[in-house]
């Protein structure tokens, strides 16, 4: 009986294992006077509360620590500031250590780490240091490969020698030596002539040296008075270098003749008048034609194409507003297309080596006319028109290729002075000084030019004659010259 009485008490004092309802709690309160407490849920709740407080405290600590740090960047971007630790075996340890060091150190300091393996340093390319403190570089394998490719391309594109072809270098050396030899020979002859003029100078001359100084106009900057003599000295040396062959019709050409060349040039004179081109364009056009024919065989069907292409090139070089390619095609009645003209243009330019600046007869005629007009014995304007007319007559005649442009210009001035005034010798010390020729040096050319001047009936090519028969040129084409005596060349 005693055991039976103690069991209910023990059972009642024990903590219930299940959930306590309101009825059970009221019964226990009435029986024992208190409600039994549940210890296990309370301990669990306290543990959860303690754990929750621990986690929140850790987060608050990290947040406060990150707020106090001056660098707002995440840890990983700060670690990659030093690129030498990429791909290392101890990267995780190094990251933690480096982040702590960078937070404590100044922003301008850099933490260098030594990689644990040698392969790490080999894979990472060298990068320049960051320009701003606190910046970082993120490099992967693709960027490393691209950097290596760029370095290889840069090495491959490094310039080598300017002349890799030894043959090209030798040709240029030959041409340079030929040019220098021509210049040296000409300058030696010019110096000898100057010494001779100084020895034969007369005290009554205006300059005291036997000739009139035509370069004393220092007020006109376009005349280049201070170095005009040096300019024309170099031009006379340059005309010896790039000049056409005087026998290319006999030596090279088989399908064209001298007459075809004359017809082409006569037609080009009309074209230049139609488009109002300057005389320098016409002279350069014919120079390009003769230089090209001196090197290349051409068929007669392509001769007119060469003519308009040469005038196109000369127009681009001399004119302010050059005619278009379509206009040159139009004047040939569209015999040649634009593509054919452009193709021929490239062929001519490459054959000339793009050397278009050559002294022509017109170049020297300006200088020699200025020297001839210094005496003022003949009208200056008429003398200029007549000398230009005689010089242009030589463009059509193939036989005048054997004379230098300066010789033709000097001969035109000689014959023009003789045609307008027979009372005086047409050659004097001033012309001899500025042309570098004596009257005996140009005798053959002057005689050939006079025959060309009088040959009006047998020549069907009258474009130049009709041009200078106009009133604006004072009809100088109608003038003739008397016989040339031998005394004029002594």
From Swiss-Prot:
The keyword Cell cycle applies. CDD domains: CYCLIN_AtCycA-like_rpt2, CYCLIN_AtCycA_like_rpt1. This is Cyclin-A2-1. One of its GO terms (biological process) is G1/S transition of mitotic cell cycle. Belongs to the cyclin family. Cyclin AB subfamily. Residues 34-76 are annotated as: Disordered. GO terms for molecular function: cyclin-dependent protein serine/threonine kinase regulator activity. Signal peptide: none annotated. PANTHER family: CYCLINS (PTHR10177). It comes from the Eukaryota. One of its GO terms (cellular component) is nucleus. Pfam families: Cyclin_C (PF02984), Cyclin_N (PF00134). Residues 63-72 have a biased composition (Polar residues). It comes from Oryza sativa subsp. japonica (Rice).
């Amino acid at each position: 009986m005693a055991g039976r009485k103690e069991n209910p008490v023990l059972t009642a004092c024990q903590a219930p294992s299940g959930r306590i309802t309101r009825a059970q709690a009221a019964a226990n309160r009435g029986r024992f006077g208190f409600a039994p407490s549940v210890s296990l849920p309370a301990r669990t709740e306290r543990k959860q509360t303690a754990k929750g407080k621990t986690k929140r405290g850790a987060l608050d600590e990290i947040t406060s620590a990150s707020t106090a740090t001056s660098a707002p960047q995440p840890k990983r971007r700060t670690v990659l500031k030093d690129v030498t630790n990429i791909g290392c075996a101890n990267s995780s340890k190094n990251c933690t250590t480096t982040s702590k060091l960078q937070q404590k150190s100044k922003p301008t300091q850099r933490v260098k780490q030594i990689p644990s393996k040698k392969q790490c340093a080999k894979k990472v390319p060298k990068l320049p240091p960051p320009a701003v403190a606190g910046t970082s570089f993120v490099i992967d394998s693709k960027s490393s490969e691209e950097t290596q490719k760029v370095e290889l391309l840069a090495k491959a594109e490094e310039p080598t020698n300017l002349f890799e072809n030894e043959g090209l270098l030798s040709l240029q050396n030959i041409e340079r030596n030929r040019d220098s030899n021509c210049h040296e020979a000409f300058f030696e002859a010019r110096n000898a002539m100057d010494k001779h003029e100084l020895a034969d100078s007369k005290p009554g001359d205006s300059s005291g040296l036997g000739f009139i100084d035509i370069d004393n106009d220092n007020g006109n900057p376009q005349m280049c008075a201070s170095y005009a003599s040096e300019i024309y000295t170099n031009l006379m040396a340059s005309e010896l270098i790039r000049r056409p062959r005087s026998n290319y019709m006999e030596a090279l050409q088989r399908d064209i003749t001298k007459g075809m060349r004359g017809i082409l040039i006569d037609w080009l004179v009309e074209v230049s008048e139609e488009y109002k081109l300057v005389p320098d364009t016409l002279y350069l056009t014919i120079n390009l034609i003769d230089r090209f024919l001196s090197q290349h065989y051409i068929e007669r069907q392509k001769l007119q194409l060469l003519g308009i292409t040469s005038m196109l090139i000369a127009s681009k070089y001399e004119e302010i507003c050059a005619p278009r390619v379509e206009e040159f095609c139009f004047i040939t009645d569209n015999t040649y297309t634009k593509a054919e003209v452009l193709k021929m243009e490239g062929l001519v330019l490459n054959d000339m080596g793009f050397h278009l600046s050559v002294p022509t007869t017109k170049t020297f005629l300006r200088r020699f006319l200025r020297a001839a007009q210094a005496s003022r014995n003949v009208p200056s304007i008429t003398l200029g028109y007549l000398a230009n007319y005689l010089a242009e007559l030589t463009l059509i005649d193939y036989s005048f290729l054997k004379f230098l442009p300066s010789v033709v210009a000097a001969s035109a001035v000689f014959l023009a002075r003789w045609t307008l005034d027979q009372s005086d010798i047409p050659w004097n010390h001033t012309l001899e000084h500025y042309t570098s020729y004596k009257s005996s040096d140009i005798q053959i050319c002057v005689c050939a030019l006079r025959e060309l001047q009088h040959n009006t009936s047998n020549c069907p090519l009258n474009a130049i004659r009709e041009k200078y028969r106009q009133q604006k040129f004072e009809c100088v084409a109608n003038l003739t010259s008397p016989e040339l005596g031998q005394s004029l060349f002594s």
